[in-house]
Regions:
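Short beta-strand->loop micro-motif that forms the acidic, two-metal-ion catalytic signature
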Residues: 131-134
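Conserved catalytic motifs of the protein kinase core domain
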Residues: 128
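Catalytic core of pol beta-like nucleotidyltransferases
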Residues: 2-110, 119-125, 136-214
Length: 214
């Protein structure tokens, strides 16, 4: 690993970053094949990058058996003081983003859900953050609409993320699901609850405001 500007070496390769992120989340050594699976890379690409990371001293290789095992070298100061804190902050950043959105709407929303490419883990730099906000009635929907522009601007300014909201009353949501409209089906199948009442409870008419998702 270079002494001057080591981040240039590490973060110039997206595949290496994926591997390091996965290794940072486990204390147990993994095979190259398992690392490839977790990082959503081909086995060959994963091994090439693991070899390179081993040469920098960031990754340890354990020899033995048919498959070599790999782990993050947690005694390495660059790993301890730079990489692990960066990945921890990366996860915290998403939680902070979701918290900001929830805090703006939780006083009157029935449910707040994230769906689309972000919920599927398939987002790209060009992707919007799709949020579905379900409210009790039309009057509440109008209150939400008045807040939307300022929230969109704040999210863009602080996180560089383009927010795309869909606002629905509980009745609109139930009707859309019952009529098997594709957008509503996608929300049912892939969404993650950020705040409030679950989709199942809404469909059964048991919506309650003020309940935060864990």
């Amino acid at each position: 690993m270079t002494v001057n500007n080591p981040l240039n070496e590490i973060f110039s390769n997206g595949s290496a970053v994926r591997i390091l992120r996965q290794l940072a989340e486990t204390m147990t050594p993994v095979t190259g094949r398992e690392c490839a699976r977790r990082s959503n890379l081909s086995h060959r690409t994963a091994l090439e990058n693991l070899n390179g990371l081993e040469s920098t001293g960031i990754v340890n290789r354990i020899f033995g058996g048919r498959d070599h095992l790999f782990s993050l070298n947690r005694e390495n100061l660059f790993v301890k003081d730079v990489l692990i804190p960066i990945f921890e902050q990366e996860k915290k950043l998403k939680r902070t983003l979701y918290r900001l959105i929830v805090d703006h709407y939780k006083d009157i929303a029935t449910s707040i859900l994230v769906f689309g490419s972000v919920a599927r883990g398939e987002d790209t730099p060009e992707s919007d953050l799709d949020i579905c906000i379900i409210v009790p009635d039309e009057s509440t929907k109008r209150k939400i609409e008045k807040r939307t522009v300022s929230v969109l601007l704040e999210v863009k300014q602080k996180f560089g993320v383009t927010l795309s909201n869909i606002l629905l009353t509980e009745k609109e949501f139930r009707n859309g699901v019952d009529n098997q409209i594709e957008l509503y089906q996608n929300i049912v199948n892939e969404s993650k609850l950020l705040f409030g009442t679950s989709i199942k409870e809404i469909m059964h008419g048991k919506a309650l405001t003020g309940k935060e998702s864990k």
